[in-house]
């Protein structure tokens, strides 16, 4: 069942982090979640040419911070910062609080799983052969230092009557190793024959330093081991 689970969801708190960081009580949670989804939808629609990798949302007290990881930051900022100011106002209206937007450049888009998935989807929409698109993206990622990459496409490939899935892989992609730093991306190509899904997994190496949540869990485990040792010593002394 290792391939059935979401590669990011299973690593949350271990080697991956959440894209939204805030706390809300039961009455506010649904509103915050809906606002986050709408903000991401609006930003991806308006800045589709910027190559958005991920959008991180934080909510400190009575404010919000939105960090956009993009391949082309100039598209987001615009001339003299006019475009980003308009975005800030729109996002502020959606979230109902003052918003600060950070634009972070993705230095190597060929190693970002989401950007690779969108690139393959765009090539499929331009009627490029799916095998050529996959092999080109895999070659670029391996050339720039990826330890492994797997790309799978599913749908009516090349206009076939029966939908099927095809995949191509180079290197290692250890999905069941929780310390593995694996990027995951998904995109859809809207072609004349229907929708074709594209999934990308990129293996960057192992993470041996724990995240904040993972470190707390490790501390709890270590604390439990120490308590067990104390209990065993006490039992021996009583005897």
UniProtKB/Swiss-Prot annotation:
Residues 39-107 form the KH type-2 domain. Residues 217-239 are annotated as: Disordered. The keyword Nucleus does not apply. The keyword RNA-binding applies. GO terms for molecular function: mRNA binding; rRNA binding; structural constituent of ribosome. GO terms for biological process: translation. It comes from the Bacteria. Pfam families: KH_2 (PF07650), Ribosomal_S3_C (PF00189). GO terms for cellular component: cytosolic small ribosomal subunit. Keywords: Ribonucleoprotein, Ribosomal protein, RNA-binding, rRNA-binding. PANTHER family: 30S/40S RIBOSOMAL PROTEIN S3 (PTHR11760), SMALL RIBOSOMAL SUBUNIT PROTEIN US3C (PTHR11760:SF19). Belongs to the universal ribosomal protein uS3 family. Binds the lower part of the 30S subunit head. Binds mRNA in the 70S ribosome, positioning it for translation. Part of the 30S ribosomal subunit. Forms a tight complex with proteins S10 and S14. This is Small ribosomal subunit protein uS3.
């Amino acid at each position: 069942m290792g391939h059935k689970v979401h590669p990011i969801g299973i690593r949350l708190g271990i080697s991956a982090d959440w894209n939204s960081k805030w706390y809300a009580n039961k009455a506010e949670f649904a509103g915050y979640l809906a606002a986050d989804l709408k903000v991401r939808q609006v930003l991806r629609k308006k800045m589709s040419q910027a190559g958005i990798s991920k959008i991180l949302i934080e909510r400190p007290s009575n404010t919000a911070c939105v960090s956009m990881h993009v391949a082309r930051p100039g598209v987001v900022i615009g001339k003299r910062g006019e475009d980003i100011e308009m975005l800030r106002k729109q996002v502020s209206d959606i979230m109902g609080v003052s918003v600060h937007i950070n634009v972070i450049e993705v230095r190597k888009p060929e190693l970002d799983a989401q950007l690779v998935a969108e690139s393959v989807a765009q090539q499929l929409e331009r009627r490029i052969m799916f095998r050529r698109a996959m092999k080109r993206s895999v070659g670029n990622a391996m050339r720039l230092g990826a330890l492994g990459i797997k790309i799978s496409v599913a749908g009516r490939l090349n206009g076939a009557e029966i939908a099927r899935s095809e995949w191509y892989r180079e290197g290692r992609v250890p999905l069941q190793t929780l310390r593995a730093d694996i990027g995951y991306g998904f995109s859809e190509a809207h072609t004349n024959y229907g929708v074709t899904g594209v999934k990308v997994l990129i293996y960057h190496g192992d993470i041996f330093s724990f995240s904040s949540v993972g470190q707390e869990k490790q501390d709890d485990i270590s604390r439990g081991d120490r308590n067990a040792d104390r209990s065993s010593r006490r039992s021996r002394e009583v005897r």
